[in-house]
Amino acid sequence: RFLYLSMRHPLTILFGYVTVFLFGMVILPFLNSPRKNFDSIPAFLLHGTIAVWLVIYFGWLGLVLTLLLPFFIASAIGSYLFYAQHNFPGVILKAKKGWTYEGAALESSSYLKTNPVMAWFTANIGYHHIHHINHLVPFYRLPELYRDVPELRQARTTSLHPLEVLRCLRLKVWCVETQRMVGVQGL
């Protein structure tokens, strides 16, 4: 329970470079299955080597400005985008009875409204629900598909508006009784 809630804590999302990338995508997968995730070692060593090289040649400030800060910002944004597209007001989660693949894509993953610049920077990640319906659709075709298939416009939505971000970050667990996501206080 503690681990589940800590994974959904805003600080875990903010420090996504360490929590999501290094620990969640590099270290933990390797520890769980070394043969399957052998590529974690080169990734970890590459990051470490680049960090040491930057400190030697450019000092600590060089490390912070060229590696840590950009990775910190990108990982925090990426971690939040993933979180918000699965934990948002109006999300619907169903047990096996009543669950369908398409229903889960449209009701349990969101359409994240973004401006054209953010859509470009994130490779149209806002169309996440379409990705869950068919992951083979290239990112550059997602807006076209969204426009041309009316059913895809019925997905639950969220945005990067500060109030919407706060609403998403407050949601932690699915309440079976009320059939909605709630914060820790709602337990």
Predicted features by range, described:
Residues 1-110, 119-122, 178-185:
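Hydrophobic transmembrane alpha-helical segments that form the core helix bundle
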Residues 96-99, 114, 138-143:
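A generic short-segment signal for beta-strand/edge and adjacent turn/coil regions
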Residues 2, 97-98, 115-116, 157, ...:
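Coil-to-alpha-helix initiation sites in intrinsically disordered, low-complexity, charged segments
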Residues 108-138:
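Acidic, Ser/Thr-rich low-complexity segments on the non-lumenal side of membrane proteins
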Residues 73-74, 127, 142:
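Internal amphipathic alpha-helical segments of the cytochrome P450 catalytic fold
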Residues 130, 135-187:
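A membrane-cytosol interface segment of integral membrane proteins
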Residues 84-87, 112-113, 163-167:
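Juxtamembrane/interface motifs at transmembrane-helix termini
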